[in-house]
Amino acid sequence: METTNFGFVASLLFVGVPTIFLIGLFLSTQEGEKSSFYSDSGKGKLDPKR
């Protein structure tokens, strides 16, 4: 039980941490004020409408 539980927590962290990082990066690009550096390089990828 402990081995599978540890594997579950490890996989959860392995998936969750990059997801939270990407969500934070996505929100910062949505605001546009904090990340003017990312907005220019990622306009074509994240903002195809503009």
From Swiss-Prot:
Recorded superkingdom: Bacteria
Pfam name, any one: PsbM
Gene Ontology process terms (BP): photosynthesis, light reaction
Keywords of the record: Membrane, Photosynthesis, Photosystem II, Reaction center, Thylakoid, Transmembrane, Transmembrane helix
Keyword Thylakoid tagged: yes
Topology in membrane: Single-pass membrane protein
Protein location: Cellular thylakoid membrane
Tagged with keyword Membrane: yes
Principal cellular location given in the protein's record: membrane
Transmembrane segments: 6-26
Gene Ontology terms: cellular component: photosystem II; plasma membrane-derived thylakoid membrane
Quaternary data: PSII is composed of 1 copy each of membrane proteins PsbA, PsbB, PsbC, PsbD, PsbE, PsbF, PsbH, PsbI, PsbJ, PsbK, PsbL, PsbM, PsbT, PsbX, PsbY, Psb30/Ycf12, peripheral proteins PsbO, CyanoQ (PsbQ), PsbU, PsbV and a large number of cofactors. It forms dimeric complexes.
Functional description taken from the UniProt entry: One of the components of the core complex of photosystem II (PSII). PSII is a light-driven water:plastoquinone oxidoreductase that uses light energy to abstract electrons from H(2)O, generating O(2) and a proton gradient subsequently used for ATP formation. It consists of a core antenna complex that captures photons, and an electron transfer chain that converts photonic excitation into a charge separation. This subunit is found at the monomer-monomer interface.
Family: Belongs to the PsbM family.
Identification of the protein by name: Photosystem II reaction center protein M
The species this protein was found in: Prochlorococcus marinus (strain MIT 9215)
